[in-house]
């Protein structure tokens, strides 16, 4: 057997490979047959796996290990098999397994079900929250979305966070509205004695319903008929009753200045206007009261002179002027108290001497002017040119 092998090797030229292993059945050992089967399986691997292994290229007829019997046989003839022995020492490492990249979600699920836990936390979070978002859009989410709490501090539900932020903003807005209402309500809580003394806070102008009450309809059928022969007091009292006008002295001045006949004619015109729907005020927000309609017709009647109208409303305009002056004085008094309180809380040591002196002089002048306004009790009466015309007698009640 050895002589045949040598003879065949002698026939092979340098650089050629011997096919003795394929021509001679049974010549190889079981280890060599196993190596052949391994070579066959390696040849069927994907081309991508062989590239990604990163090992240098080797001839395909190489063996993984050298058998001791083969080494002893090859050592007997060093000259003929030296090149073969060197080539047998090259090892063919098995290429590393390179799994293809999962292109779809089903592959990832299969990998996760295979026993290996995939560390894809944010992918799971995104999937859960997308499901919650879809359920919310469909309107089938009647409760808070359940989220996996196994991640503890890494758990974050952006839908729940948005809901909580919205609730916090609504709560803050309600709190601000409540504080504003309390502030406005406290502003109106002033005692009458303090208002008379000018020591209370300003009271805001009341609404129309608070000042005028519910609108009363005109009483078309009075208590009795009135004529020019009746006295002025009787005519004025009946007109005030039918108009539901509380200011009877104003109606009495109207009857006295323009006469009983003209006053009764204006009453009939007022009844006709009220039956047709009434009159609106200038801005159109509400209808005039029957007394307001009566006074409006009085001012717009050409036969009534302007001097007569000024004489009728002189006392009312004078009261309104005094009320405005008193309101202005009260505002100045409240402002002075706030200024004094603010000055006491200032720390003027932080500024230089010149700034402190200037501030002190300006403050003293302002406080002195406030004291002068508070001490002055004499009010000059208005001239006829300063009289303010009004549309409704009820609008004179400012406070």
From Swiss-Prot:
Residues 1-10 have a biased composition (Basic and acidic residues). Residues 1-83 are annotated as: Disordered. It comes from the Eukaryota. The keyword Hydrolase does not apply. Gene3D superfamilies: PHAX RNA-binding domain. One of its GO terms (molecular function) is RNA binding. GO terms for cellular component: cytoplasm; nucleus. It holds the Pfam family PHAX_RNA-bd. Residues 11-22, 68-80 have a biased composition (Acidic residues). Keywords: Cytoplasm, Nucleus, Protein transport, RNA-binding, Transport. One of its GO terms (biological process) is protein transport. Residues 37-53 have a biased composition (Polar residues). It is found in: Nucleus; Cytoplasm. InterPro entries: PHAX, PHAX_RNA-binding_domain, PHAX_RNA-binding_sf. Signal peptide: none annotated. Belongs to the PHAX family. Probably involved in protein and RNA export from the nucleus. This is Phosphorylated adapter RNA export protein.
């Amino acid at each position: 057997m050895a002589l045949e092998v040598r003879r065949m090797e002698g026939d092979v030229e340098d650089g050629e490979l011997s096919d003795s292993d394929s021509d001679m059945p049974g010549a190889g050992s079981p280890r060599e047959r196993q190596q052949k089967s391994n070579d066959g399986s390696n040849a069927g691997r994907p081309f991508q796996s062989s590239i990604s292994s990163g090992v240098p290229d080797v001839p395909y007829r190489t063996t993984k290990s050298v058998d001791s019997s083969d080494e002893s046989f090859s050592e007997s003839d060093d000259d003929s098999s030296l090149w073969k022995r060197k080539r047998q020492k090259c090892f063919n490492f098995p290429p590393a397994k390179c799994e293809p990249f999962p292109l779809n979600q089903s592959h990832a699920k299969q990998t996760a079900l295979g026993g290996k836990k995939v560390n894809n936390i944010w992918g799971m979070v995104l999937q859960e929250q997308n499901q919650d978002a879809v359920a919310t859009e469909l309107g089938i989410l009647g409760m808070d979305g359940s989220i996996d709490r196994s991640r503890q501090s890494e758990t974050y539900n952006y839908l729940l966070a948005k809901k909580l932020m919205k609730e916090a903003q609504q709560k803050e807005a309600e709190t601000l509205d409540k504080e504003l209402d309390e502030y406005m309500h406290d502003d109106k809580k002033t005692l009458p004695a303090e208002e008379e003394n000018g020591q209370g806070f300003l009271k805001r102008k009341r609404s129309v319903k608070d000042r005028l009450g519910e609108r009363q309809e005109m009483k078309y059928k009075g208590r009795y008929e009135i004529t020019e022969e009746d006295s002025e007091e009787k005519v004025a009292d009946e007109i005030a009753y039918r108009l539901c006008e509380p200011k009877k002295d104003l109606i009495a001045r109207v009857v006295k200045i323009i006469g009983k006949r003209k006053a009764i004619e204006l009453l009939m015109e007022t009844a006709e206007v009220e039956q047709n729907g009434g009159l609106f005020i200038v801005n159109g927000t509400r209808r005039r009261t029957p007394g307001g309609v009566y006074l409006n017709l009085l001012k717009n009647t050409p036969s009534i002179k302007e001097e007569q109208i000024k004489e009728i409303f002189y006392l009312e305009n004078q009261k309104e002027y005094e009320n405005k002056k008193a309101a202005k004085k009260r505002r100045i008094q409240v402002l002075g108290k706030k200024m004094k309180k603010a000055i006491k809380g200032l720390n003027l040591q932080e500024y230089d001497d010149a700034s402190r002196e200037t501030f002190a002089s300006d403050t003293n002048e302002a406080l002195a002017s406030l004291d002068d306004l508070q001490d002055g009790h004499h009010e000059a009466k208005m001239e006829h040119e300063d009289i303010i015309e009004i549309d409704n007698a009820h609008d004179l009640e400012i406070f």
